[in-house]
Amino acid sequence: MDGNKDDASRCLRIAEDAIVSGDKERALKFINMAKRLNPSLSVDELVAACDNLDSVSRNSSVSEKLKTMDGDDDKLETGKMKYTEENVDLVRNIIRNNDYYAILGLEKNCSVDEIRKAYRKLSLKVHPDKNKAPGSEEAFKKVSKAFTCLSDGNSRRQFDQVGIVDEFDHVQRRNRRPRRRYNTRNDFFDDEFDPEEIFRTVFGQQREVFRASHAYRTRQPRNQFREEEINVAGPSCLTIIQILPFFLLLLLAYLPFSEPDYSLHKNQSYQIPKTTQNTEISFYVRSASAFDEKFPLSSSARANLEGNVIKEYKHFLFQSCRIELQKRRWNKKIPTPHCIELQDRGFVDRHIPI
């Protein structure tokens, strides 16, 4: 019962936000939902506020894009377009759908493996490099969000409780807390969500398949014999590449292996915090007594180890800053905490254009 009251209060907060933004339909929807969850709630004032609003569809931008798609249907018959009616229908259905399970064509009891397979299949069909239909970028982003949400246990449970994409995204943004300055966690439901990063993570270098096919068509005829040689040798090379990791694993199994002396990030094995003396960079060790015995304070061994910590952390900041700057090209509002820390710690000689 208390859970229903909490959900009802949350619905009222969403309704209040909708009223402020002038979205009458959304406000009434969540007012009614709150009333069903907790009949004792008084919603007369909110209903009265809704009566003073003109109904504004919060999906107007999507509707305009769909109308543009409809207008382009006639152009498909001229043969000038680089997409088919099937491409348009696929993009249109994904954009209109408000259920992550339905977008991927899955049931609610599906496994993580089924989610991954569905994403691999659908993302290839809707990727903007392959599907040139209007709205393919938005559809590709929505497919990536569906995969990211459902493949994570916590976000999937939260979505199952809500069941609607729009409300789920709204709750994610509303519940977001101010981030710590050097937080490295990826939040896939804010403005810095990058569908290409998800695609590269799942497919790896297979991302280049679209560009490779284009390059093949633009080569000069005198290089055709080279292309045939590559095509013939391709499968055998691919087989070797696939088998190579297994040989490496077998080799590593018989090699002597020693645990690292430290880790920049806390985990089950490294939980004891330490800090470098001058730069105050945090790192973690397995055992405080064993570490201090092996690396006494003010010893050359301790100085060398802390030098490695600083070097590794500096490299981590550079890599993280590079990713932040790439994302910032898409959205200027994206924060760049790692770039700021690089400058604050004096790890760079020049100002980073943020």
Swiss-Prot record:
Pfam families the UniProt entry points to: DnaJ, DUF1977
Protein topology in the membrane: Single-pass membrane protein
Membrane spanning residue stretches: 237-257
Domain of life: Eukaryota
Gene3D superfamilies: DnaJ domain (1.10.287.110)
Alphabetized UniProt keyword annotations: Chaperone, Membrane, Transmembrane, Transmembrane helix
Annotated GO CC locations: membrane
Subcellular location: Membrane
Keyword Transmembrane helix among UniProt keywords: yes
Domain J: 99-163
SUPFAM superfamilies: Chaperone J-domain (SSF46565)
Family to which the UniProt record says this protein belongs: Belongs to the DnaJ family. C/III subfamily.
Biological role: Plays a continuous role in plant development probably in the structural organization of compartments.
Name of the protein: Chaperone protein dnaJ 49
Natural source organism: Arabidopsis thaliana (Mouse-ear cress)
Gene name of the encoded protein: ATJ49
